[in-house]
Amino acid sequence: MTKQTIKQTPFFLDAHSVLDATLRDAGYLNDWSFSREEIFAVVGGVAESGVEVVEVGYISDKPDRILAGCCEPDFLGELREHTKGKINLAVMISLTEKNPQTLFASRQGVLDLVRIPCTIEEVDDALRVAAAASEYGIATSLNLVNISTLLPQQFAATAQKVQQSGVVDVFYLADSRGACRPEDISKIVGIVRENWQGLFGFHAHDNTGFATVNALMALEAGCEIIDGTVNGLGLGSGNTKLQYAMQLVQQKEPNKPYRYEPLDRLSRFDVAMPAEKSYFYYLVGAKNLAQLWVEPLVERYGEKTAYYLQQIPRRPYTKIEQVFAEVEADV
């Protein structure tokens, strides 16, 4: 089956756009255990704000997942009816899903965009998933993660491969570790922009306090789409706050009809994170470590975790065993 044309919605027509990732990224903090009321409130409020895309969560057929953790077809249909078509519905899919084609087939007509996160080693797998989604008229985003660990030539080669594949609608860069600095973003986005002609997005994390500045630098260097979350909620130190992302895009597109009043109603929405972990997430960003390594590091080193992290050099660690070796070489 040939690839269908992307549906003509505001998201795909506008020069610059915002994607809300609250339910998906903040779900790492509570294992996506949001209630129906919370999900409808977030999706409805974001839709009223005029933001172009809302990411509802993950699609999955795993039996232990509910609501935002699996995004069943009927549930997506209810959300589409709730928002009256004012916003595009997006989800993320893990490459660990065994039957992506079945997931896409059952959600045809109620899902606008699927985001496929992958490391540079997983790009070919992600392209196969994108091809499957395209068969059902679902737009695709390949989200390259851990960009703070990659070299310039790797960005160029990956962008060229994705461009040549013909199955990806949006190429995304994700600063998954919150380790990138503004000058890094300008260079990385510039390299990809030279090799990728399609829609281009950026997802920031705020571990070292650069999420908003990095989102701005991404827009200035050639990205069209940036992510934000309600109250900046997300894994680790969170993401660019949604209202900040909206303001950055409005600087590019002054006539954007964004409304900020609906966000006031969402200001109380929160997902708790243990306060004692907040400093660890700053350190993993500063040292260029994966955020999901915080738990195993604390389990291994206990109260000495912060001290050990302060001692190790900043490097593009790709495996947690490399961090263990670095720490224990000096113990």
List each language-model region with its residue ranges.
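Catalytic cores and adjacent flexible loops of soluble metabolic enzymes
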Residues: 2-331
